[in-house]
């Protein structure tokens, strides 16, 4: 099993500063370039001029339609993609640390499937965005509770039981989603549910930026404030208890924060899978397993990753590809590789 406990491989402060600068530059450049990418292309110079025109008295040299595309269509979409990527990456890093398991993520342990059912049910009965995020959070938390309860053996959650419990729980909630689609109005509710479930930022707006931003930032801040406790949990329950940590309470605080993040992303963008599983591994390669550094690094990398995935989704072909399809195509092979590597190291023993 891959150790997720803090070690001495984390970068020294000077290298850490360089890492933050590089990631922040990449994030800013990614957002800037993405504002010009799409079926209606806008040059980088015009994008910069449009943005500066909001704060400086610049004579417009761009077309009004370019300004509308950049500020009203692409900007909220990119902000939502960045928030979703950062939130899911933070959630995945937190779950992997809490469970001492590099193979878990919001989708693997059933949170996404539970939130998907809650969201689909909310769409079926109402058009309220508040109900959508509330139902997604409630059922996402319920799914996590079921998985965690089933997977516990002799006072701990084993890797094998955790993955299997996640598969079972995901299958159950997927069946409930299928029932919801079966009874939905085929001319109204069904298309809305199906398109939403595939994951997309096409319906982005500044209202949705607020919808996803408040819970994602709140949940991510809770996780970050718990980073030292997650480091201790990564040592194991017995070691954590011997150091005076209240293991169950700490774990549940983190789990509630993760469920809030996942539910907000599902409510705003549908199912965007595999980000929370894959991105923490790449972040860990750069920072080591110390969550003091890992969590913010995962957030930045996740934001950059999902921004570029969305670029591919909306610019590769004439018809927009759902983001969830692309993340699954990229994430599933990585998960298969991780499973194989863990199996070779005797993953069933933990």
Task: Describe the residue ranges of each PLM region.
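Alpha-helical transmembrane segments in inner-membrane proteins
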Residues: 2-350
């Amino acid at each position: 099993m891959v150790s997720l406990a803090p070690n001495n491989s984390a970068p020294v402060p000077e290298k850490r500063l360089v890492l933050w600068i590089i990631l922040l530059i990449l994030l800013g450049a990614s957002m800037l370039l993405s504002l010009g990418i799409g079926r209606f292309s806008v040059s980088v110079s015009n994008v910069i001029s449009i943005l500066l025109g909001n704060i400086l008295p610049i004579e417009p040299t761009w077309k009004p339609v370019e300004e509308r595309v950049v500020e009203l269509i692409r900007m909220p979409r990119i902000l939502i993609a960045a928030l979703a990527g950062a939130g899911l990456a933070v959630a995945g890093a937190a779950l992997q640390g809490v469970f001492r398991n590099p193979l878990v993520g919001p989708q693997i342990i059933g949170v996404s499937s539970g939130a998907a059912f809650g969201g689909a049910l909310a769409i079926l009965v109402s058009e309220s965005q508040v109900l959508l995020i509330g139902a997604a959070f409630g059922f996402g938390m319920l799914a996590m509770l079921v998985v965690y309860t089933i997977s516990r053996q002799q006072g701990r959650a084993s890797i094998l039981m955790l993955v299997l419990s996640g598969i079972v729980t995901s299958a159950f909630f997927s069946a409930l989603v299928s029932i919801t689609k079966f009874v939905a109005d085929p001319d109204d509710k069904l298309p809305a549910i199906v398109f939403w479930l595939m994951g997309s930022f096409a319906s982005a707006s500044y209202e949705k930026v607020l919808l996803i931003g408040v819970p994602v930032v709140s949940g991510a801040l809770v996780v970050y404030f718990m980073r030292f406790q997650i480091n201790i949990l990564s040592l194991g329950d017995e070691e954590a208890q011997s150091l005076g940590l209240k293991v169950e309470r700490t774990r549940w605080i983190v789990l509630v924060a993760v469920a809030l993040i996942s539910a907000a992303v599902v409510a705003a963008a549908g199912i965007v899978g595999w980000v929370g599983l894959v991105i923490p591994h790449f972040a860990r390669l750069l920072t080591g397993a110390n969550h003091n550094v890992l969590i913010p690094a995962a957030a930045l990398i996740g934001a950059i990753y999902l921004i570029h995935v969305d670029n591919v989704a909306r610019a590769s072909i004439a018809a927009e590809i759902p983001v969830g399809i692309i993340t699954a195509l990229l994430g599933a092979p990585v998960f298969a590789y991780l499973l194989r590597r863990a199996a070779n190291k005797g993953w069933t023993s933990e």
